[in-house]
Amino acid sequence: MSNIYNIEILQIIDSVAREKGISKEILISTVEQAVQVAGRKKYGNEYNIKAQINRKTGEINLLRILKIVEDVEDYLTQISLEDALVKNPEAKIGDEIYEYLPPIDHARVSAQAAKQVITQRVIEAEREKQYHDFKDRKGDIINGIVKRIEYGDIIVDLSRAEAIIKKDQLIKGEHFKPNDRIKAYVQDVRQETKGPQIFLSRVDNQMLVKLFKLEVPEILEDIIQIKSVARDPGSKAKIAVFASDSSIDPVGSCVGIRGNRVKAVTNELNGEKIDIVLWSNDLAQFIVNSLIPLAPSEITKILIDEDSHKVEVVVSQEHQSIAIGRRGQNVRLASKLTGWNIDIMTEEQESKRRNEEFSTSTELFMEALDVEEVIGQLLSVTGFNSVEQIASSEISTLTRIEGFEEELAVEIKNRAIHYVDLKNEKIIKKLEELGVEQELIDILELPLELILKFAEYGIKTIEDLGEMSVNEFKNLAPNSNITDENIKLLIKTARHHGELKDS
């Protein structure tokens, strides 16, 4: 039997469902749960109680659920088949029997349910809806209105939700005030207890990529590809582009007529100057292109060291400052763009460095291999700069050196191997004395000299490695050819290993 309170509940539910865009069924189920709680408080928690609301009349009924069993152990929640057949001739073991319970004060309970539970469920449902609306927007550019500023963080009104731009995700020097329009990149969407958290950024590299996609149709259509990006947000950026169709000028397409396309991106990013660089699978050419505004003709020489993942670019004295850029910005961005550590040197500096390296390696070979100066010089001028390189080289490589017959080549190689073995034995002994775990040596896969350096710094176990930062790792192994991503993976693996040990 329905009454005015029951009808009022349905009206409240209808109104909230329409206004908030929440399923009517979800709200009714929520009220039913509240009534069930009230029923258990009155009749006892030991009862299995269910509330039902008639979707048309709003009538509320309380029912006790009894499970049909062969042997009744709990008379509050179970019923025998014999007793169940009296109530329902078609009853069988495993079914449930519903018994109506005397009504409680539905008017009071209904009002409380409408006021408290619906409100809470609306909040939860809105949070769920916001999360589902925005979780697929991760990686998009989004527009909003600055709602307020809290300790430097910007709270952005997205109409159906709020987002946050942390202070460190804002471009340095830009200022926003309430009601300003703002465009940002959706960096992450997380479901948390207090609701969905939408994190925006204006400094993420992908912000630049997405803006170019908006301005350059050829990028959106994948005719032009963005290969890599490097940014000093708000100051300068470099973006490497490529088109497989040789008839298309990817750089010109991104710049636009009279620079209109790149200017649009620059204006959005608080005046960030952008160099459009032509990508090439020829590393030397890509390095040359990346150093714009330095002209290719102003580069004298490029020396690529694959072992240390370094590139030396030799220029004249007058062009060095252009190549390096203000406070090293140009070469730093070029290094990030290409993924190689680029060092700019003048012709004089390069000549001096080569002479110093030649002298150093010659002296090393004379002492380590017990050879005359002329042999040390021949090894140095051939390109060897460590005893390890000689030890691992082929005899045929050594015999190509002028004056090196096979007998001499074999002797030099054997002396190099002996030197390296003795050196490694000393390092291994030192590592043992320091208590370095073999697992750490295995996972690092670095020369023993570097591992000793790690150990002397205090990194002796995989757990120690897991507590390192990428910068710490790079400072200890500056000349290793391990990329930042692989360093992160090493540290992550070490942390996971430590967690498994603790569990």
UniProtKB/Swiss-Prot annotation:
GO molecular function ontology, one term from the record: nucleotide binding
Name of protein: Transcription termination/antitermination protein NusA
Keyword hit for Transcription: yes
Function: Participates in both transcription termination and antitermination.
Subcellular location: Cytoplasm
PANTHER family: TRANSCRIPTION TERMINATION FACTOR NUSA, TRANSCRIPTION TERMINATION_ANTITERMINATION PROTEIN NUSA
Record flagged with keyword Transcription: yes
Domain S1 motif residue range list: 139-203
Family annotation (SUPFAM superfamilies): Nucleic acid-binding proteins, Prokaryotic type KH domain (KH-domain type II), Rad51 N-terminal domain-like, Transcription factor NusA, N-terminal domain
Domain KH: 308-378
Keywords, comma-separated and alphabetical: Cytoplasm, RNA-binding, Transcription, Transcription antitermination, Transcription regulation, Transcription termination
The protein's assembly and partners: Monomer. Binds directly to the core enzyme of the DNA-dependent RNA polymerase and to nascent RNA.
Gene3D superfamilies linked: 3.30.300.20, 5' to 3' exonuclease, C-terminal subdomain (1.10.150.20), Nucleic acid-binding proteins (2.40.50.140), NusA, N-terminal domain (3.30.1480.10)
GO CC, alphabetical: cytosol
Entry's family note: Belongs to the NusA family.
Encoding gene, per UniProt annotation: nusA
Biological process, per Gene Ontology: DNA-templated transcription termination; transcription antitermination
S-S bridge residues: none
